[in-house]
Every structure is written in C-alpha cells, then in structure tokens.
Design a protein with these regions (language model features):
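Long, highly charged, low-complexity internal segments
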Residues: 154-159, 166-192, 199, 347-467, ...
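Leucine-rich, amphipathic alpha-helical/linker segments
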Residues: 499-522, 690-736
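Non-catalytic, charged low-complexity extensions flanking SF2 helicase motor domains
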Residues: 49, 53-54, 70-105
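Conserved segment of the helicase C-terminal RecA-like domain
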Residues: 3-9, 21-30, 34-65
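Accessory beta->alpha helical hairpin/"wing" motif in late/C-terminal subdomains of nucleic-acid enzymes
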Residues: 472-498, 651-688
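Short hinge/gating elements
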Residues: 12-18, 46-50, 112-116, 198-199, ...
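Intrinsically disordered, low-complexity regulatory segments
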Residues: 108-315, 321, 365, 606, ...
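C-terminal or mid-to-C-terminal helical accessory/interaction module adjacent to the motor/catalytic core
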Residues: 78-86, 100-105, 111, 208, ...
Length: 752
C-alpha cells in the first residue's frame, strides 16, 4: 500500500504476477543524449519527446533525474513552441552538413566556440566540475597537476586546481623584515611563491631547498612549479576563468593568479559560484565579472596585519615567554639534577628560541576566554546547586541555594526521605518557529554538541561536501535562502509527504538579497537516499564519504528542511515546585498539537512526560561547576564578540591546540588551558593589552568590513596598523627593557 501511495513507481499485474515498474534513468540519459552532437561549432540542439503511458513513471523519471541534475525539468508539449525548436534544430544540422562537406571552413565554424582554462582551488572540486560534462579527457601535467578537458557547448574547457594559495608575503624584506616596503607614503607588500615541506607539511616563503624545521629537514615543493604550468596553459586558450572561493580569501587568490597569468593570457575573467553544481557552474561561466578590488584590498590588510602583529608578538613569545616558562616549569627537575651533581643540560635550550610559541590578535582573546572558563570551574562562587526530583520515569531538576543543598544532602546521607510537592498550575499552547539554516558558526556549534567533532574536523568535512557538490559554500555568515534553495526544500517535502506537502511547506528566505547563502543541500536528496545512491553507483562522487560525512550532511539537511516548514504548536505544562520552604516555577514541554517542523527536526525540543500533582521524592542533590569551554562554546563566543570570521573560527582553536596552549580533556573533549598557555596569555595581557584585547580586535574587524564596503581606504588602515606596531611593540622601549631584564634573570649567566 505504501508503494502505491508514492506516485513515482508503478505496480502492475500481468498474467497473475505482480510487477514493480521503475523508470530507467541511465537509459534515458543515454538515449536523449543521442539527440545532440558535438561539432566544431559547439553542441547541436536536441529534442527529447516522451510519450507517457503512466504518469507515475514520468514522475519517477523527473525525480530521479533531479538527483543527478538539479536543474532538470520536463515540460508539457503545449508549453513549448515546437515549430521554433524544430526550425532551430534543422538550421543547425544544415550548418553541420556544410561544415562536414567543406562548404564552411572549420576555422570559421569554431569562432562561436571558445577555449577556456577554468582554475579552481581544489583538485576534488576540479574533478567534480569536470564530471558534470561527461567523461573528461585527462592530462597529467606533472606529478601533482591534472587538467580535465570537457565541452560545455559554449566552451571547450580545461579545468585545473591551483591547490590553494600560490603566493604569500616574503620574509627578510621591508620594515622589520616582515615583507612590506614603504615607499612615498605607501605600503607595498612583497609576495613570493609558497614552499611546502613534503614530509611535515610546513609552509614558508624563504628561498630554501629543505624544510627549515630542525627536526624535519624534508624535501620541498614550491608553487612556482604550479604557476609555470598555469602560464603555459593560459597561452593555449582564448580566455582564463578564475573560479576561486567566493570570499575575500578566494578573491585574493584569484587576483594573485590574474597578476601572474596576465602576460600570458588573452583575457582573464573572474567567475563566482556558491555551490558546485552543473547549473551554478554554467551560470557563473555565462556571467563572468571583474575582480572586486575592495575584497582584494581587505584581504591584503588582513594578511599584512596578521604578519606584522603575529611576527612581532611571536618573536617576543618565542624568546622571552619561552625562557620564563621553560626555566620555571623545569625548576623542580633542575633542583633534583643539582642534588645529584648532574650538569644542567636542559637549561641552554630554555634560552634558545622555541618556534612553537606564537601570539596573534584573535588567538589571544580566545585563549583568554578558555582560561576564564577554566578559572570559573575552580571558583565556588560560580557553582550552582540542584535538587533532583524523581517524577515517574523522569527527573525535575530544580536550582536551589547552597544552604538548601547542604541541608538536603545531609538528610539524604543520613538515610532520611526528603520530598517535594509539585503543584500543576496548568497547560498552555505555544507556537514555535523553526531555527534558520546553518551559518558557519551555528554548524560548528551543532556538530560539536551533537556529534562531538572538533571545529577543524567539521570544516574539513564541510569542505569535502562542498567540493563534491552536495552542499552550498560553507564559509558564510548569511542565513539567506535563494529561490533554488526553496525549490530543493519543496521537492524534498513533496517526496516525503506527497500531495499533502503543502500543509507542511512554508518557504522563507531568512534574509535580504545578496550573493551569500546559508549552508544547505544543493539537491533534493535526503541523507538515507544519498547513502543509497552512492552505494548503488547512481551518484558517482570523486572521493568516498565516511560515516562522519553522512552525519554532518544529515545535520545540514534536517536543519535546512526544517527552516522551510511550518511552525510547531507545542504544549507546555506549568508547575509550581516546593522544596524545603522554597517555591519555584517550572515549565516543561509535554507534547505538540501540531508537530510542524519537529517532524523533521525533533532534536530541537525535548518533550517530557506530563506530571500529576502530588508529593515526589528528592532522589539526589548535585553541585555543578561551570563547564570547561568546548569547541562550540568558543565559536559562539567569537561570533558574539565580533572577532574572527567564518573562515578562521576553526583555525584559531586548532592553532591554540597546535601550540599546546590548550589541550583536550579525554572524556568531555573540552578545552583546558596548559601552564604554557596561561603564562603566555598573562604576559601578553600584562604588556600588550591595548593590542590584543577583545575591543581592539573587534574594531579591527569593523575596519576590514569598511574596506570591503568601500568606506575606507586600505592604505589608511595600514598606516594606523603600522603606527600601532611601531609605537606599542617594536619601539616600545619600556616594554623591551622589562623583557630584557626578565630574560637576563633567567638566561643572563648562560652562554647560548
């Protein structure tokens, strides 16, 4: 019966046997593809006419085709101008015939078809895009670079990946050797190609043949090799299309590529897409734009500021803070060695720079927040106290003061029965709207809470899902939903509820217009269907999906579909709970008269059992310390404070872990500061609070935004930042003197 209700497969009975008829998508693609042909002028127009003898199978064909091609549609014959289409087909075929017979020269025919080089950042993304246009020709250009050649109709396209950034600021040039020159009142950043250690992955810009990390010394690859390949390819094509990510960082990578390829290319255009789908790629190719120099300038300022402040503070941390930490931390060990008359072999190392110490404008306040949460856990004034009341199979948790907590705890320890009285005030009904779809910070928060994943891992998974064409761009602070997104939600709800889908569907844009969108699925494929399509080989992805990929996709899918559904109507029970002379109001969600979006997203609200009035036992009392910060707490705090960006949320936390300033607790996976982290933070706040504080960091983010919006000149901001660097750090003699005096206390008698 359920199969009959689906409306996209047919159940028939012939010769006393039952059959299930399912549309054959692969055969349809193959057959309809024969109506078009590739020729020197492009791809001929084709027409596929389907004679329908069972509407259910047509519905099934349309649904299954949309799984593979999100913009696929079938139109009724009366909706199109058949004569016009046939005329265009016949004219085009006559043209092909003339080309083949030699009446039209091939060179003239190909004028309509251009060759293009499409550069994206990721090899997986390049491979995914190529798969949209048939089976590509593959060219292995060197050990790392592969080009995929396909035909899109308008273009013969070579698709290749730059593999991320190609250039970064040089070192040992400019003011303080930080890679920025000052000439005629202007700041000129000096860039060079990035080098990367094959062994440990360390990236740098020094002109070195081996990895500079002492313990490694591995072989090095350099982006100059990538650039040379791209320059050669640029000479072969009519136009270079740069399709790097649609954010400030992507704009800067694209601009670097433009500058490097300009002497070799006839024409260079920027294309922008927010999802890796066939429709989005074709739209972007057909609507190229110029580079947004405001975004490029904002990213230049971000990188220069990061270099200036990061290098200046890190140099101090690597020498002065490391020496203090190392010697004070090893003090006990050194005393033991002295008692045994052993040489202090550890001490000289304490007085050499430790390159794993660093500091930065954003990471410092984030470290401070983690430390504050740790200190709160050890502050009795921040503790909370609860009594747990046993109500049938559930628990009512009621907050009480410390005196009540101690009194009841003593009674329970002595074996006394302690009760509470629960009075039912009444029931009330409320309407609850669904939450908006995910932004970067809310996705990181949800995945951390529900899946226990680190922010770095979530961003890796989201990057994979984006590059595979399964979700929209994942570095976003927008909740906006496009018409294409609303269409995805409609199709999913229609699949789930059939003709009744309109009862559940309530489309919302969740924000004003703009380029950026919320994180959402790109196609109407639910998580279970995705797993099935991949398993059966119907949906072929360029890399395998893990269990965690499916889990994160489920979060994104359910949150998005819920955001396009009607509100829920829930029932709340109001209670008055009396304990030990105290009285408190308690509300519990006990049901729903209309589940609405909770049908898809039940985790949003916890539904508990309805309570009857009466006396109930207190089964326990608990003392709750403020919890340590977890990944989602840090991300939420950064968002609230206005520091950091979607592209840096995960990186900041990972940097603190890499520097061993914080560590993960084994069970809770919470963030706990280490001794070295506390020392570095304390010294930074003591000496540079006006540089690394929350407020000054937030103001800098606002300045970056003003540059992006064209409200501030980026050179003016660079001048302000340089003055800050000079006055407050590099030439702050009071601070330098204090640092040197401390250093001499620890290392003055040691020859290094």
């Amino acid at each position: 019966e359920k199969l009959k209700e689906k409306g996209d497969i047919a159940l028939v009975r012939e010769n006393d046997k039952d059959y299930i008829l399912i549309p054959d998508v692969a055969t349809y693609i193959q057959a309809s593809g024969r109506t078009s042909r590739l020729y020197p002028g492009g791809v001929t127009k084709g027409l596929s006419i389907i004679i329908v003898d069972d509407q259910r199978l047509l519905n099934g064909l349309k649904k299954r085709m949309k799984w593979l091609y999100e913009d696929f549609d079938i139109k009724a014959l009366e909706e199109i101008d058949l004569d016009k289409i046939m005329r265009e087909i016949n004219e085009e075929r006559a043209r092909v015939k003339k080309i083949l017979s030699g009446e039209i020269e091939v060179e003239k025919a190909v004028e309509l078809t251009k060759t293009a080089l499409l550069i994206v950042e990721s090899p997986n993304k390049a491979k995914t895009i190529a798969s949209f246009f048939g089976k590509p020709s593959i060219r292995q250009l060197n050990e790392r670079l592969v080009a995929y050649d396909v035909a899109t109709g308008r273009y013969v396209l070579s698709i290749i990946a730059s593999i991320g950034h190609v250039y970064d600021l040089a070192v040992k040039v400019g003011e303080y050797g930080y890679g920025v020159l000052r000439e005629n009142g202007l700041f000129i950043p000096v860039y060079t190609d990035i080098k990367r250690c094959v062994k440990c992955g360390y990236q740098f810009t020094d002109e070195l043949d081996r990895c500079p990390i002492r313990e490694c010394g591995g072989e090095v690859t350099r982006k100059l090799d990538v650039i040379k390949v791209l320059q050669d390819l640029a000479t072969e094509v009519d136009v270079v299309l740069i399709g790097t990510d649609p954010d400030t960082e992507g704009e800067k990578i694209g601009w670097d590529l433009k500058v490097l390829l300009e002497p070799y290319a006839r024409e260079i255009k920027r294309i922008e897409f927010h999802e890796v789908t066939r429709r989005a790629i074709l739209e972007a190719i057909n609507k190229p734009r110029d580079f947004d120099m405001r975004l490029v300038e904002a990213q230049i300022v971000r990188r220069v500021e990061d270099r200036w402040l990061g290098f200046a503070l890190s140099e101090i941390a690597q020498k002065y803070f490391w020496a203090e930490y190392c010697i004070t931390k090893l003090h006990e060990k050194l005393l033991k060695l002295m008692k045994r008359s052993k040489q202090l072999t550890d001490l000289p190392d304490c007085c050499e720079k430790n390159m794993n110490f660093s500091a930065g404008r954003v990471q410092t306040p984030v470290l401070g927040y983690i430390i504050e949460r740790f200190r709160d856990q050890h502050d009795p004034e921040k503790y909370k106290y609860y009594v747990l009341i046993g109500v049938n199979e559930s628990i009512i948790r009621l907050e009480v003061n410390r005196d009540v907590f101690l009194n009841i705890r003593e009674k329970l320890r002595e074996g006394e029965e302690v009760t509470s009285y629960v009075k039912v005030v009444g029931l009330k009904e409320e309407e609850v709207n669904p939450p908006p779809p995910f932004t970067t910070d809310t996705l990181l928060e949800e995945a951390s809470m529900r899946l226990g994943l680190s922010s770095t891992r979530v961003m890796e998974i989201a990057q994979d899902l984006f590059e595979l064409g399964l979700i929209t761009y994942h570095r976003t602070d927008s909740t906006r939903v496009s018409d294409a997104g609303i269409a995805v939600a409609r199709a999913c709800l229609e699949e789930k509820y059939g003709d009744k889908y309109k009862e559940y569907f309530k489309p919302r844009t969740w924000g004003a217009g703009g380029a950026h969108e919320a994180i959402r699925p790109t196609r109407p494929i639910d998580p279970d269907r995705l797993r099935q399509l991949v398993r059966e080989g119907i949906l072929v992805l360029v890399r395998p999906l893990t269990r965690q990929h499916y889990e994160v996709y489920r979060l994104i899918f359910e949150r998005f579909i819920a955001s396009q559904m009607k509100p829920a109507r829930i029932v709340k029970q109001e209670l008055e709970v009396k304990v030990n002379g105290l009285s408190a109001k308690v509300e519990r969600v006990v049901g729903a008269t209309d589940k609405g979006f909770l049908e898809i997203y039940p985790e949003y609200l916890e539904v508990e059992e309805e309570v009857k009035e009466g006396e109930y036992p207190i089964v326990n009392v608990i003392e709750v310390k403020p919890p340590l910060a977890r990944f989602h707490d840090v991300i939420k705090w950064m968002k609230t404070q206005g520091i950091g960006r979607p592209s840096t949320y995960a990186k900041i936390v990972q940097t603190l872990l890499n520097r061993r300033y914080v560590e993960l607790t084994p069970k809770q996976k919470a963030l706990k500061p280490t001794d070295r982290g506390v020392l570095v933070y304390n010294r930074l706040i003591e000496l540079f609070s006006d540089v690394v504080g929350v407020e000054v960091t937030r103001r800098l983010e606002e300045k970056m935004k003003e540059i992006e919006e064209g409200k501030r000149d980026y050179q003016d901001v660079l001048r302000e930042l340089f003055e800050e660097l000079k006055v407050k750090i590099k030439e702050n003699m009071e601070v330098i003197k204090k640092l040197e005096e401390r250093y001499m206390e620890y290392c003055g008698g040691i020859k290094v």
